[in-house]
């Protein structure tokens, strides 16, 4: 079943601000005066929703691992001391995507940025590169998964959805699918659930569905 939500940029910002006001996280990733230039690993122990306590290991890549990022965006991410978390399935650098997210033909980017044990999904629209939009913010350990029993890593992945790949909403959010003329962001908890973020008339339409 696909669930539809429409969220304004203001509402998202308020939600993330509230989340960031929580007590500081105890995480292996520590603050540094300099921007990390090499791959880092965040490790620790956490209790899963089923009550089992496991060890996790999350690979974090520096922004320099993504040379195709425009300099203006890379500079902002480095200023925030961002590292890009990689899923436990990753074989090549991931979780940085490029497409027409604002409108047809626009040149936009989305990036997962991990800082001090928490990750934010930032979107850089061409019309406001200097003011990235934060679509989701959560602890790095919120979504974990593994290919091998006991070897847990991040299960948060983002990818580009072309207009034809955007799922239908039973609520009729997109009665005329010919109006879907630009890309969307697939924001997934791998093998569990996913959300599709589509920007329309200044609002992010969010379609959520289990995998």
Residues of each region from the PLM?
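Acidic/hydrophobic-patterned starts of short beta strands in beta-sheet-rich repeat architectures
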Residues: 103-113, 180-186
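Extracellular C-terminal loop/segment signatures of secreted glycoproteins
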Residues: 123-139
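Primarily extracytoplasmic ectodomains and periplasmic/lumenal surface modules that are beta-strand-rich
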Residues: 104-107, 116-120, 129-130
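N-terminal post-signal-peptidase region of extra-cytosolic proteins
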Residues: 92-99, 109-111
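Short, non-transmembrane alpha-helical segments in secretory-pathway proteins
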Residues: 61-90
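Acidic, small-residue rich beta-repeat scaffolds with periodic aromatic anchors
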Residues: 5, 11-16, 20-64, 139-211
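Acidic, divalent-cation-chelating loop motifs in proteins
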Residues: 96-104, 126
């Amino acid at each position: 079943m696909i669930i539809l939500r429409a969220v304004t940029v203001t509402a998202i910002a308020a939600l993330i601000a509230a989340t960031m006001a929580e007590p500081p996280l105890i995480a292996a990733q520590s603050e540094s005066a300099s921007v990390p230039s090499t791959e880092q690993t965040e490790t620790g122990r956490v209790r899963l929703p089923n009550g089992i306590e496991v060890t996790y290991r999350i690979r974090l890549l520096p922004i320099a691992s993504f040379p195709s990022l425009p300099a203006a965006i890379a500079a902002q991410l480095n200023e925030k001391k961002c590292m890009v978390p990689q899923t436990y399935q990753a074989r090549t650098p991931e979780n940085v995507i490029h497409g027409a997210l604002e409108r047809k033909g626009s040149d936009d980017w989305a990036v997962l940025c991990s800082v001090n044990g928490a990750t934010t999904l930032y979107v850089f629209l061409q019309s406001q590169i200097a003011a990235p939009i934060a679509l989701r913010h959560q602890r790095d350990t919120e979504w974990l998964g593994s290919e091998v029993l006991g070897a847990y890593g991040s299960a948060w992945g983002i990818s580009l959805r072309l207009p034809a790949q955007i799922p239908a909403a039973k609520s009729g959010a997109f009665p005329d699918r010919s109006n879907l003329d630009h890309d969307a962001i697939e924001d997934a908890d791998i093998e569990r659930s996913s959300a599709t973020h589509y920007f329309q008339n200044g609002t992010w339409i969010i379609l959520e569905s289990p995998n």
